[in-house]
Design a protein with these regions (language model features):
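Anion-recognition interface
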Residues: 2-347
Length: 347
C-alpha cells in the first residue's frame, strides 16, 4: 500500500500598517521573539529588516522605489529564498510602508507572485484608526521627518484630496476604502483582514492570525510616542530653516530637539486637537467608515462629544497663554548649536 501526501501551501500574513497604528511596537515585539516564534512554527524573516528589531521596511522600499532602499538590508529575492528554506508553515511580514503600494498595484502583483512561487498563500492584515486621531498623530510624525507646513495647510489638503503626499511617494490615504480595494483586487477580498486599531495592537493581531494562544515576551514600551507641543512648534521652525541643507545635517538638527529635556506639563499634555477639525474629519470621511463597516463589518468609531470636550480644554490657542514661549526658542537655539559645533569640529 502506497501512502501519498499532498503538499499544502504555507501561509503568510502580510501586515501593511497603516501608519500610526502601533506598527513599530508590534514589529519590535515580533522581532524580539523571533526564536520563540520559530519554536511555534512561525517565521519572522530577517531579510528586509533594516535593524534587529524593525519590520520589513526594505522590502516595501524596494517595491516603492524609495531612496532609503539598500541591498545590504535584504531584497525580495533574498526574502523569498529565506521563506523557501524555512520549515515553518506560517510566516509574518510587516511594514507600514506597504501601505504606499495601494497606488502601485503592479508592484503588489509582483510581490504576490514572488511569494506564491515559493509556496505561500497570502493574507493581508491592515489596521485603521479614526481619521481625526490619525491626522493629529500623522502630522506630528511627518514634522519629525522634515514637514514644514502648518497643521491647517496639512488638514486642508487631506480634506480636499482625501490623502496627504510627502517626498513624492509617501502617500497617506485617509479614504481607507481606496487602500482596501487595491489590496483586495490583488490578493482577493477574502484574504484582506480589515481591523479597527486598539492599543495594544499585538493582542488583536495575534487573534486575527489565529495565534492567540502564543505567549510572547513583552518588552519595554517601544511605541512611537507623540512629541510635546513645544517640540512640534520648534521642529516646524527648524524644518523651514533647514530646507536647503543636506538630509544628514537637517536630521542632526531635528535629533537635537528629540533628545532635549523640557519641563513637564502633566495637566496640559495635549496634541493638536481642535473641535472644528474633529467635526470636519467626522463628516468628510463618514462614507469611508460606512463602507468599511458594510463590507468588512469593522467599525471605526469617533466619540464626538467626548473628543470635542477634551479638545476645547486643551486646544493650542488655550495652551499658548500658559506655556512659556522661551522653551520653544531655547529648543531651536540648542538644535542649531549642535550643528554649529559639529561643523567646527570637522575644520
Amino acid at each position: 500500500m502506497t501512502n501519498t501526501t499532498q503538499k499544502s501551501c504555507k501561509r503568510l500574513f502580510l501586515h501593511i500598517g497603516t501608519h500610526k497604528t502601533g506598527s513599530t511596537a508590534l514589529q519590535t515585539l515580533l522581532a524580539k521573539n523571533d526564536r520563540l516564534l520559530v519554536d511555534n512554527n512561525i517565521l519572522f524573516p530577517n531579510s528586509g529588516r533594516i535593524s534587529t528589531c524593525s519590520g520589513h521596511h526594505n522590502i516595501a522600499w524596494e517595491l516603492n522605489g524609495d531612496p532609503r532602499f539598500t541591498k545590504e538590508n535584504g531584497t525580495i529575492s533574498e526574502l523569498c529564498l529565506e521563506l523557501a528554506a524555512s520549515d515553518c508553515n506560517l510566516a509574518i511580514i510587516s511594514s507600514e510602508d506597504f501601505e504606499y503600494l495601494h497606488q502601485k498595484p503592479d508592484q503588489l502583483y509582483f510581490l504576490k507572485t514572488a511569494l506564491e512561487n515559493v509556496g505561500y498563500e497570502i493574507d493581508v492584515i491592515v489596521f485603521f484608526r479614526d481619521q481625526a486621531r490619525y491626522a493629529y498623530s500623522l502630522y506630528q510624525e511627518l514634522v519629525k521627518h522634515g514637514l514644514d507646513r502648518t497643521f491647517y495647510s496639512f488638514s486642508k489638503e487631506v480634506f480636499r484630496t482625501g490623502a496627504f503626499v510627502m517626498n513624492g511617494n509617501w502617500r497617506f490615504c485617509f479614504s481607507y476604502e481606496v487602500i482596501i480595494q487595491t489590496f483586495a483586487k490583488v490578493f482577493g477580498s477574502n484574504h484582506v483582514h480589515c481591523e479597527a486599531y486598539s492599543n495594544p495592537i499585538h493582542i488583536q493581531f495575534l487573534l486575527v492570525c489565529g495565534l492567540s494562544e502564543i505567549s510572547l515576551e513583552l518588552s519595554d514600551n517601544t511605541s512611537n510616542k507623540a512629541l510635546p507641543l513645544e517640540k512640534i512648534v520648534a521642529l516646524l521652525r527648524i524644518n523651514e530653516f533647514t530646507k536647503g541643507m543636506s538630509e544628514q545635517d537637517a536630521s542632526k538638527v531635528r535629533n537635537a530637539i528629540f533628545s532635549s529635556q523640557i519641563p513637564e506639563h502633566p495637566n496640559l499634555s495635549c496634541t493638536l486637537n481642535n473641535p472644528v477639525f474633529i467635526i470636519l474629519h467626522y463628516v468628510r470621511f463618514r462614507p469611508t467608515r460606512t463602507w468599511i463597516r458594510t463590507h468588512y463589518n469593522t467599525k471605526i468609531t469617533i466619540t464626538i462629544i467626548k473628543d470635542i470636550t477634551s479638545s476645547i480644554k486643551c486646544s493650542p490657542i488655550f495652551l499658548w497663554k500658559r506655556r512659556r514661549r522661551h522653551i520653544i526658542d531655547s529648543l531651536v537655539y540648542e538644535a542649531f548649536d549642535v550643528l554649529k559645533n559639529d561643523v567646527e569640529s570637522q575644520k
